Each structure stands twice: as C-alpha cells, then as structure tokens.
C-alpha cells in the first residue's frame, strides 16, 4: 500500500508538477503592487496594518519597525512603583484599551485596502503609539501620586 502511494505521488511530482499548482504563480509580477491574496501571518497583522496606514512607503516602514521596537521601551515607560495592576484601576482600563486596539489592528491588517478600513487603521495606529508613549507614563505617575508612593 505504501509503495503504491509513494509511486503515485512521485509520478505526480515528477511527470506533472503543475497539475496541483496555483494559477497565481504564472501571472507576471508587479514590484509596485502587492497581490491581494498575500497577507502576513496572523501574529504580524497588527504591524502590517500600521505599515499600510501610512501612505508614504518610507514612513510606513519606519512606523512598522518602530511599532515592534517600541516594545523594547516598555520597561523604561513603566514608571509605576507598584508591580501589580490589582490596585491600579486606570492602568487596568488602559491595558484593556490597548488589547482592544491591538485586536482592531489585527483585524484591519487582514482586510483589503479600502475606504473605511484605511481610516480605522490610521486611527488605531495613532492610538497604539499614543497609549504606549504618552498615556502609560502619565497614568503611572498619576497612580503613584494617588497611592502616595
């Protein structure tokens, strides 16, 4: 049984390699346009949405790189004296807003580049950077003052 299966698969691969091929493999390439069926993996869709939200190519690439490198700055931006978020309700709320924003960016990254998705992606991208760079340190400082640390 195994030999028949191997014989069938080898004859398929060696004698008719294009039989199961994708027809998109034979269309001429356009280096200025990404085909609509090409999408990154689901865990990079948020960064892909940030890349597409900026019309300038260099700006989009810089935003893409900074959206991933900004995660390196997280320990420096965490200015709270208390490690846990149990007694920090503002930080809890901000965390869930960031999670919702990342889910929105992930959803937008999988959508086509059309009118409502472009605007939603731009707003979600601005909110992503605004939460991490501005709101997180301000919220931590306010909560430090409220807890008298």
From Swiss-Prot:
UniProt topology in membrane: Multi-pass membrane protein
Concerning Pfam families, the annotation shows: Cytochrom_B_C
For activity, the cofactor(s) needed are: heme
Coiled-coil regions in this chain?
none
Q: Where in the cell is it found?
A: Mitochondrion inner membrane
Q: How is the cofactor bound?
A: Binds 2 heme groups non-covalently.
Q: How does it assemble?
A: The cytochrome bc1 complex contains 11 subunits: 3 respiratory subunits (MT-CYB, CYC1 and UQCRFS1), 2 core proteins (UQCRC1 and UQCRC2) and 6 low-molecular weight proteins (UQCRH/QCR6, UQCRB/QCR7, UQCRQ/QCR8, UQCR10/QCR9, UQCR11/QCR10 and a cleavage product of UQCRFS1). This cytochrome bc1 complex then forms a dimer.
The protein in question is named Cytochrome b
Name the species this protein comes from.
Cervus nippon nippon
